[in-house]
Protein backbone atom coordinates (compact mmCIF):
# COMPACT_ATOMS: atom_id res chain seq x y z
CA UNK A 1 0.00 0.00 0.00
CA UNK A 2 2.87 2.36 0.87
CA UNK A 3 4.45 1.65 -2.51
CA UNK A 4 1.21 2.55 -4.26
CA UNK A 5 0.97 5.79 -2.31
CA UNK A 6 4.55 6.63 -3.29
CA UNK A 7 3.82 6.00 -6.98
CA UNK A 8 0.70 8.12 -6.85
CA UNK A 9 2.58 10.89 -5.03
CA UNK A 10 5.33 10.84 -7.65
CA UNK A 11 2.71 10.96 -10.39
CA UNK A 12 1.08 14.07 -8.99
CA UNK A 13 4.48 15.56 -8.24
CA UNK A 14 5.31 15.15 -11.91
CA UNK A 15 2.10 16.93 -12.90
CA UNK A 16 2.93 19.84 -10.63
CA UNK A 17 6.58 20.07 -11.58
CA UNK A 18 6.34 20.04 -15.36
CA UNK A 19 4.69 22.20 -17.97
CA UNK A 20 6.05 22.70 -21.46
CA UNK A 21 4.69 26.24 -21.86
CA UNK A 22 3.68 29.20 -19.73
CA UNK A 23 2.73 32.84 -20.14
CA UNK A 24 5.63 34.43 -18.26
CA UNK A 25 8.39 31.90 -18.90
CA UNK A 26 8.73 31.10 -15.19
CA UNK A 27 7.46 27.57 -15.80
CA UNK A 28 8.17 26.30 -19.30
CA UNK A 29 8.45 28.15 -22.61
CA UNK A 30 7.24 31.76 -22.25
CA UNK A 31 4.77 33.42 -24.61
CA UNK A 32 7.45 35.26 -26.57
CA UNK A 33 9.09 31.90 -27.40
CA UNK A 34 5.97 29.85 -28.13
CA UNK A 35 6.49 30.00 -31.89
CA UNK A 36 9.95 28.41 -31.56
CA UNK A 37 8.44 25.22 -30.16
CA UNK A 38 4.98 25.55 -31.71
CA UNK A 39 5.33 27.09 -35.22
CA UNK A 40 1.60 27.78 -35.57
CA UNK A 41 1.89 30.32 -32.74
CA UNK A 42 3.71 32.56 -35.22
CA UNK A 43 1.04 32.21 -37.89
CA UNK A 44 -1.06 34.81 -39.71
CA UNK A 45 -4.44 33.99 -38.12
CA UNK A 46 -3.65 34.03 -34.42
CA UNK A 47 -5.92 34.81 -31.49
CA UNK A 48 -6.83 36.75 -29.46
CA UNK A 49 -7.21 40.07 -31.28
CA UNK A 50 -8.29 43.60 -30.54
CA UNK A 51 -11.78 44.10 -31.97
CA UNK A 52 -11.81 47.60 -33.47
CA UNK A 53 -15.52 48.35 -33.64
CA UNK A 54 -15.13 51.03 -36.34
CA UNK A 55 -13.65 48.39 -38.65
CA UNK A 56 -16.18 45.65 -37.90
CA UNK A 57 -18.33 44.67 -40.89
CA UNK A 58 -22.05 44.37 -40.21
CA UNK A 59 -23.37 41.17 -41.78
CA UNK A 60 -27.19 41.07 -41.63
CA UNK A 61 -27.21 37.46 -42.84
CA UNK A 62 -25.58 36.25 -39.60
CA UNK A 63 -28.28 34.65 -37.48
CA UNK A 64 -28.19 34.39 -33.68
CA UNK A 65 -26.28 31.38 -32.39
CA UNK A 66 -28.38 28.44 -31.26
CA UNK A 67 -27.15 27.08 -27.91
CA UNK A 68 -28.81 23.68 -27.62
CA UNK A 69 -29.29 22.12 -24.16
CA UNK A 70 -27.34 24.91 -22.47
CA UNK A 71 -30.45 25.58 -20.38
CA UNK A 72 -30.69 22.06 -18.89
CA UNK A 73 -30.92 22.39 -15.12
CA UNK A 74 -29.17 20.79 -12.17
CA UNK A 75 -26.44 18.91 -14.03
CA UNK A 76 -23.09 17.76 -12.64
CA UNK A 77 -19.76 18.81 -14.16
CA UNK A 78 -16.12 17.98 -13.45
CA UNK A 79 -13.91 20.99 -12.70
CA UNK A 80 -10.12 20.67 -12.97
CA UNK A 81 -7.03 22.72 -12.23
CA UNK A 82 -4.85 21.97 -15.26
CA UNK A 83 -1.92 24.10 -14.11
CA UNK A 84 -2.78 26.97 -16.45
CA UNK A 85 -6.41 27.70 -15.60
CA UNK A 86 -9.63 26.20 -14.30
CA UNK A 87 -11.42 23.99 -16.83
CA UNK A 88 -14.94 22.56 -16.61
CA UNK A 89 -15.96 19.61 -18.79
CA UNK A 90 -19.18 19.83 -20.80
CA UNK A 91 -21.35 16.94 -22.04
CA UNK A 92 -21.70 16.12 -25.77
CA UNK A 93 -25.46 16.62 -25.47
CA UNK A 94 -24.78 20.36 -25.50
CA UNK A 95 -23.91 21.93 -28.83
CA UNK A 96 -23.69 25.22 -30.68
CA UNK A 97 -25.32 25.72 -34.08
CA UNK A 98 -23.86 28.52 -36.18
CA UNK A 99 -25.58 30.75 -38.71
CA UNK A 100 -24.85 28.38 -41.62
CA UNK A 101 -26.27 25.37 -39.76
CA UNK A 102 -22.95 23.79 -38.75
CA UNK A 103 -23.16 21.98 -35.41
CA UNK A 104 -20.28 22.17 -32.94
CA UNK A 105 -20.34 19.77 -29.98
CA UNK A 106 -19.36 21.16 -26.57
CA UNK A 107 -16.08 20.02 -25.03
CA UNK A 108 -15.27 22.24 -22.03
CA UNK A 109 -14.94 25.82 -20.88
CA UNK A 110 -12.17 27.62 -19.03
CA UNK A 111 -11.23 31.08 -17.80
CA UNK A 112 -8.56 33.73 -18.31
CA UNK A 113 -7.93 36.35 -15.62
CA UNK A 114 -5.35 38.88 -14.39
CA UNK A 115 -4.48 39.65 -10.76
CA UNK A 116 -0.70 39.99 -10.82
CA UNK A 117 0.67 43.29 -9.44
CA UNK A 118 -2.88 44.44 -8.71
CA UNK A 119 -3.84 44.08 -12.37
CA UNK A 120 -7.57 43.38 -12.33
CA UNK A 121 -8.12 43.09 -16.08
CA UNK A 122 -7.34 39.70 -17.60
CA UNK A 123 -9.40 39.05 -20.72
CA UNK A 124 -7.70 37.88 -23.90
CA UNK A 125 -9.81 39.70 -26.49
CA UNK A 126 -9.96 43.46 -26.17
CA UNK A 127 -12.63 45.80 -27.55
CA UNK A 128 -11.20 49.04 -28.94
CA UNK A 129 -8.09 48.43 -26.85
CA UNK A 130 -10.00 47.92 -23.59
CA UNK A 131 -9.24 44.71 -21.71
CA UNK A 132 -12.17 43.29 -19.74
CA UNK A 133 -11.94 41.90 -16.23
CA UNK A 134 -12.00 38.22 -17.29
CA UNK A 135 -12.87 35.99 -20.20
CA UNK A 136 -14.40 32.53 -20.49
CA UNK A 137 -13.95 30.27 -23.53
CA UNK A 138 -16.60 27.65 -24.32
CA UNK A 139 -14.80 25.24 -26.64
CA UNK A 140 -16.69 23.18 -29.24
CA UNK A 141 -15.66 20.79 -32.02
CA UNK A 142 -17.24 20.24 -35.42
CA UNK A 143 -19.74 17.39 -35.31
CA UNK A 144 -18.57 16.31 -38.77
CA UNK A 145 -15.32 14.96 -37.30
CA UNK A 146 -16.93 12.85 -34.58
CA UNK A 147 -14.54 13.60 -31.71
CA UNK A 148 -12.49 16.49 -30.39
CA UNK A 149 -9.27 14.59 -31.06
CA UNK A 150 -10.22 14.21 -34.72
CA UNK A 151 -11.43 17.80 -35.08
CA UNK A 152 -8.68 19.70 -33.26
CA UNK A 153 -6.30 19.67 -36.24
CA UNK A 154 -8.86 19.84 -39.06
CA UNK A 155 -10.08 22.78 -41.13
CA UNK A 156 -13.12 24.40 -39.49
CA UNK A 157 -12.59 21.93 -36.66
CA UNK A 158 -13.31 24.16 -33.68
CA UNK A 159 -15.63 26.95 -32.58
CA UNK A 160 -15.14 28.95 -29.40
CA UNK A 161 -17.77 31.08 -27.71
CA UNK A 162 -15.97 33.88 -25.84
CA UNK A 163 -17.66 35.57 -22.89
CA UNK A 164 -16.26 38.78 -21.42
CA UNK A 165 -16.76 39.85 -17.80
CA UNK A 166 -17.20 43.18 -16.09
CA UNK A 167 -16.97 44.07 -12.43
CA UNK A 168 -19.48 45.51 -9.99
CA UNK A 169 -18.15 46.50 -6.59
CA UNK A 170 -20.75 44.65 -4.51
CA UNK A 171 -23.19 42.81 -6.82
CA UNK A 172 -22.42 39.13 -6.23
CA UNK A 173 -23.33 36.88 -9.15
CA UNK A 174 -24.88 33.91 -7.36
CA UNK A 175 -24.77 31.78 -10.52
CA UNK A 176 -20.98 31.70 -10.10
CA UNK A 177 -20.97 31.18 -6.33
CA UNK A 178 -20.66 27.38 -6.48
CA UNK A 179 -17.79 27.52 -8.98
CA UNK A 180 -15.89 30.05 -6.87
CA UNK A 181 -16.54 28.16 -3.63
CA UNK A 182 -15.22 24.95 -5.22
CA UNK A 183 -11.87 26.50 -6.15
CA UNK A 184 -10.47 25.58 -2.74
CA UNK A 185 -10.89 21.92 -3.71
CA UNK A 186 -8.61 22.21 -6.75
CA UNK A 187 -5.80 24.35 -5.42
CA UNK A 188 -3.07 22.20 -7.03
CA UNK A 189 -2.64 21.10 -10.69
CA UNK A 190 -4.31 17.79 -11.46
CA UNK A 191 -6.93 18.11 -8.73
CA UNK A 192 -10.60 17.80 -9.68
CA UNK A 193 -13.93 18.42 -8.03
CA UNK A 194 -17.59 18.01 -8.98
CA UNK A 195 -20.00 20.89 -9.53
CA UNK A 196 -23.59 19.97 -8.74
CA UNK A 197 -26.91 21.58 -9.60
CA UNK A 198 -25.36 23.81 -12.26
CA UNK A 199 -27.12 25.30 -15.28
CA UNK A 200 -24.65 26.42 -17.93
CA UNK A 201 -27.01 28.94 -19.52
CA UNK A 202 -27.02 30.88 -16.24
CA UNK A 203 -23.26 31.39 -16.58
CA UNK A 204 -23.72 33.29 -19.85
CA UNK A 205 -24.86 36.90 -20.33
CA UNK A 206 -28.55 37.63 -20.86
CA UNK A 207 -28.02 38.50 -24.52
CA UNK A 208 -26.39 35.63 -26.41
CA UNK A 209 -27.80 36.69 -29.79
CA UNK A 210 -25.36 39.46 -30.70
CA UNK A 211 -21.71 38.69 -31.37
CA UNK A 212 -18.50 39.47 -33.23
CA UNK A 213 -17.01 36.65 -35.29
CA UNK A 214 -13.72 36.06 -37.07
CA UNK A 215 -11.36 33.20 -38.10
CA UNK A 216 -8.55 32.60 -35.64
CA UNK A 217 -6.66 30.11 -33.53
CA UNK A 218 -6.35 28.52 -30.14
CA UNK A 219 -4.91 31.11 -27.74
CA UNK A 220 -2.55 28.57 -26.15
CA UNK A 221 -0.03 26.18 -27.73
CA UNK A 222 -0.20 24.60 -30.23
CA UNK A 223 -2.13 27.72 -31.44
CA UNK A 224 -3.85 25.74 -34.22
CA UNK A 225 -5.47 28.07 -36.78
CA UNK A 226 -8.80 26.31 -37.24
CA UNK A 227 -11.04 28.18 -34.81
CA UNK A 228 -14.10 30.25 -35.64
CA UNK A 229 -14.47 32.74 -32.81
CA UNK A 230 -17.77 34.12 -31.54
CA UNK A 231 -17.22 36.95 -29.05
CA UNK A 232 -20.48 37.89 -27.35
CA UNK A 233 -21.29 41.60 -27.16
CA UNK A 234 -22.99 41.38 -23.76
CA UNK A 235 -20.95 40.72 -20.62
CA UNK A 236 -21.31 38.78 -17.37
CA UNK A 237 -21.05 40.76 -14.13
CA UNK A 238 -19.09 39.58 -11.08
CA UNK A 239 -18.44 41.37 -7.81
CA UNK A 240 -14.96 42.59 -6.97
CA UNK A 241 -14.74 40.05 -4.14
CA UNK A 242 -15.56 37.21 -6.54
CA UNK A 243 -12.89 38.31 -9.01
CA UNK A 244 -10.25 38.65 -6.29
CA UNK A 245 -11.07 35.13 -5.04
CA UNK A 246 -10.68 33.67 -8.54
CA UNK A 247 -7.35 35.45 -8.97
CA UNK A 248 -5.91 34.06 -5.74
CA UNK A 249 -7.22 30.52 -5.33
CA UNK A 250 -5.38 28.06 -7.61
CA UNK A 251 -1.72 27.20 -8.15
CA UNK A 252 0.35 26.48 -11.25
CA UNK A 253 2.97 23.75 -11.82
CA UNK A 254 5.55 25.75 -9.84
CA UNK A 255 3.24 26.23 -6.85
CA UNK A 256 2.75 29.87 -7.77
CA UNK A 257 -0.70 31.44 -7.80
CA UNK A 258 -2.15 31.40 -11.32
CA UNK A 259 -2.41 35.04 -12.36
CA UNK A 260 -2.26 36.98 -15.63
CA UNK A 261 -3.05 33.82 -17.55
CA UNK A 262 -3.85 35.47 -20.85
CA UNK A 263 -2.13 35.86 -24.20
CA UNK A 264 -1.34 39.26 -25.71
CA UNK A 265 -3.52 40.38 -28.61
CA UNK A 266 -2.18 39.30 -32.00
CA UNK A 267 -1.96 41.17 -35.34
CA UNK A 268 -5.20 41.15 -37.30
CA UNK A 269 -3.37 40.67 -40.63
CA UNK A 270 -6.27 41.98 -42.74
CA UNK A 271 -8.82 39.54 -41.34
CA UNK A 272 -12.42 40.73 -41.49
CA UNK A 273 -14.27 40.82 -38.18
CA UNK A 274 -18.02 40.59 -38.70
CA UNK A 275 -20.95 41.28 -36.40
CA UNK A 276 -24.64 40.52 -36.60
CA UNK A 277 -25.53 43.90 -35.10
CA UNK A 278 -24.86 47.58 -35.70
CA UNK A 279 -22.97 49.37 -32.95
CA UNK A 280 -24.33 52.61 -31.52
CA UNK A 281 -22.10 54.80 -33.67
CA UNK A 282 -23.16 52.97 -36.83
CA UNK A 283 -26.81 53.33 -35.84
CA UNK A 284 -26.37 57.06 -35.21
CA UNK A 285 -24.59 57.55 -38.55
CA UNK A 286 -27.24 55.57 -40.42
CA UNK A 287 -30.06 57.49 -38.74
CA UNK A 288 -28.35 60.83 -39.42
CA UNK A 289 -27.92 59.88 -43.10
CA UNK A 290 -31.56 58.79 -43.26
CA UNK A 291 -32.72 62.16 -41.89
CA UNK A 292 -30.57 64.06 -44.40
CA UNK A 293 -31.95 62.05 -47.30
CA UNK A 294 -35.51 62.57 -46.08
CA UNK A 295 -34.89 66.29 -45.85
CA UNK A 296 -33.62 66.35 -49.43
CA UNK A 297 -36.65 64.43 -50.68
CA UNK A 298 -39.04 66.80 -48.92
CA UNK A 299 -37.39 70.02 -50.09
CA UNK A 300 -36.20 69.25 -53.62
CA UNK A 301 -38.47 66.91 -55.60
CA UNK A 302 -41.29 69.40 -56.24
CA UNK A 303 -38.96 72.00 -57.77
CA UNK A 304 -37.26 69.37 -59.91
CA UNK A 305 -40.54 68.00 -61.22
CA UNK A 306 -41.80 71.48 -62.06
CA UNK A 307 -38.59 72.29 -63.92
CA UNK A 308 -38.84 69.11 -65.95
CA UNK A 309 -42.46 69.88 -66.89
CA UNK A 310 -41.55 73.37 -68.03
CA UNK A 311 -38.67 72.10 -70.13
CA UNK A 312 -40.89 69.50 -71.72
CA UNK A 313 -43.62 72.07 -72.43
CA UNK A 314 -41.28 74.55 -74.13
CA UNK A 315 -39.61 71.81 -76.13
CA UNK A 316 -42.94 71.11 -77.84
CA UNK A 317 -43.03 74.65 -79.23
From Swiss-Prot:
Biological process terms in GO annotation: detection of chemical stimulus involved in sensory perception of bitter taste
Keywords assigned: Disulfide bond, Glycoprotein, Lyase, Metal-binding, Secreted, Signal, Zinc
Gene3D superfamilies for the chain: Alpha carbonic anhydrase (3.10.200.10)
MF terms (GO), sorted A to Z: carbonate dehydratase activity; zinc ion binding
A GO CC term attached to the entry: cytosol
Disulfide-bond pairs as recorded: 41-223
Major subcellular site: secreted
Tissue expression as described in the entry: Major constituent of saliva.
Residues bound to substrate: 219-220
Class in the EC hierarchy, top level: lyase
Span of domain Alpha-carbonic anhydrase: 19-277
Residues glycosylated per entry: 255
UniProt-annotated binding residues for Zn(2+): 110, 112, 137
Signal peptide limits: 1-17
Domain of life: Eukaryota
Cofactor(s) the record lists: Zn(2+)
Cell location: Secreted
Active-site residues, as the UniProt record annotates them: 84
Family stated for the protein in its record: Belongs to the alpha-carbonic anhydrase family.
Summary of the function given for this chain in its UniProt record: Reversible hydration of carbon dioxide. Its role in saliva is unknown.
Name of the protein: Carbonic anhydrase 6
Gene source species: Mus musculus (Mouse)
Amino acid sequence: MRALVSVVSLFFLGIQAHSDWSYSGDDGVGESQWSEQYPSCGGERQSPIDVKTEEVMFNPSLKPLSLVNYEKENLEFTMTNNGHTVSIDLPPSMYLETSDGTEFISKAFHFHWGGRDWELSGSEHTIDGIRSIMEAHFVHFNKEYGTYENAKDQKNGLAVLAVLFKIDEYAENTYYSDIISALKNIEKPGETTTLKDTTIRNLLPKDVHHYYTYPGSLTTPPCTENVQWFVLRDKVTLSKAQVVTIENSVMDHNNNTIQNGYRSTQPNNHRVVEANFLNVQDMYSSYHLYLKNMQKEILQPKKQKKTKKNRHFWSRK
